[in-house]
Amino acid sequence: MENGKCNGATTVKLPEIKFTKLFINGQFIDAASGKTFETIDPRNGEVIATIAEGDKEDVDLAVNAARYAFDHGPWPRMTGFERAKLINKFADLIEENIEELAKLDAVDGGKLFQLGKYADIPATAGHFRYNAGAADKIHGETLKMTRQSLFGYTLKEPIGVVGNIIPWNFPSIMFATKVAPAMAAGCTMVVKPAEQTSLSALFYAHLSKEAGIPDGVLNIVTGFGSTAGAAIASHMDVDKVSFTGSTDVGRKIMQAAAASNLKKVSLELGGKSPLLIFNDADIDKAADLALLGCFYNKGEICVASSRVFVQEGIYDKVVEKLVEKAKDWTVGDPFDSTARQGPQVDKRQFEKILSYIEHGKNEGATLLTGGKAIGDKGYFIQPTIFADVTEDMKIYQDEIFGPVMSLMKFKTVEEGIKCANNTKYGLAAGILSQDIDLINTVSRSIKAGIIWVNCYFGFDLDCPYGGYKMSGNCRESGMDALDNYLQTKSVVMPLHNSPWM
């Protein structure tokens, strides 16, 4: 290991790139324009595949296929039980191809192969199984009408054609969190994966065909946000768009939806999540969770605990332990089983993170460890910790989306809560303490969609997550996610001579 980087030795065979075309109406086809774009291996900056570049014309074709499949096809007309069987078959095929999918996400996005193999891809299959289990349990309710002459009930119906726009940081899990509930609800869809990480989405399209998902239910248009993504957001025949990504892009999608057909919009956006470490926390565990919360997935995670607040009684000890442990946080080839952090997703993100690190230095924060790129090939960055960060600094305010931690001190519980809420975001937060009354007070006071107590990244298939404030307007995972793809219809009729009400 040199400068905190593993040697990258691996015996894993790299994946064969089999699918690079658009997937529309059950077929892999070239883009109408014939255009393609290159996808880059972030380990070395080299081209690994040339992928079809879809734009508005291709989105039109995909939406037409999805519309026909919804209006005339079998998918929304199947019983939930029948849909569930096909979705479970899809999950079976995902599990049979775990290694291949994990390899694709590793070479495409720099994700650790072991993480993909044992976490991301199994969780992807899990989301499809969870929603398959929900597909035959979608129902309305009988209403207790206030007017005795009326009988009413509600129906839950699929919303229609959905545009799902997927981010690059978790290309498999985010694919599943949107596609699985949409399928279970009976929707058809057009999916645009991030241009940086399109390979696994195309492989999932292939598996959906093998599973027997009817043509037109799942369509994949690879391409860029400014063209393909914008066409989905503004399309007059798309009934709903779901997006995970930056707050700035989410705002543009909402504007496009409003300017077109007022389609429903679900947004899961940026974060600048706080981790509050109180005086009674276990110092060793606190340091481990702080590093995990900030550096997991190379910091490219919307709920990263990038702002760490430590109560003054244990601040010095926590800082010492953080610096000590950060130096053992190995960075290297994602196929190296000893690596804990791979390369950033692409050159643009790599340069953005390094720019923020320079801002931190120039604005007066104290660099405790890291702060540099590693090597002269690929997009590797040292885990970086700043102390003496103040609320007016860019590294405090902005979502960096990289392995950069801002470390601050606080005195009282009230001050800690105020610091935690001092952000435009509200996606997640962590609390480390043994005091149940304090935990209850702080967890109720922080304005965030999910709070982790004495743990971090406590995700579960049944547990919804999403944002307050500028972190979004929806919840994903759990039964709440299914509601994103359903709409409620009320049916009312006269009722005469009822024996009781």
From Swiss-Prot:
Binding site for NAD(+): 245-250
Family: Belongs to the aldehyde dehydrogenase family.
Residues forming the catalytic site: 268, 302
EC supergroup of this enzyme: oxidoreductase
Binding partners and assembly: Homotetramer.
Reaction it catalyzes: an aldehyde + NAD(+) + H2O = a carboxylate + NADH + 2 H(+)
GO BP term, example: phenylpropanoid biosynthetic process
Compartments it resides in: Cytoplasm, Cytosol
Domain of life: Eukaryota
Disulfide bond sites: none
GO molecular function: aldehyde dehydrogenase (NAD+) activity; coniferyl-aldehyde dehydrogenase [NAD(P)+] activity
Record keywords, A-Z: Cytoplasm, NAD, Oxidoreductase
Coiled coil: none
Organism: Arabidopsis thaliana (Mouse-ear cress)
InterPro entries in alphabetical order: Ald_DH/histidinol_DH, Ald_DH_C, Ald_DH_CS_CYS, Ald_DH_CS_GLU, Ald_DH_N, Aldehyde_DH_dom
Gene: ALDH2C4
Site (Transition state stabilizer): 169
Matching Pfam families: Aldedh
GO CC term (a single one): cytosol
Chief location bin: cytoplasm
Protein name: Aldehyde dehydrogenase family 2 member C4
Known outcome of mutating residue 152 to E: In ref1-7; reduced activity on sinapaldehyde
Record's function text: Involved in ferulic acid and sinapic acid biosynthesis by oxidation of conyferylaldehyde and sinapaldehyde, respectively. Can oxidize L-lactaldehyde. Possesses activity on acetaldehyde and glycolaldehyde in vitro.
Enzyme Commission designation: 1.2.1.3
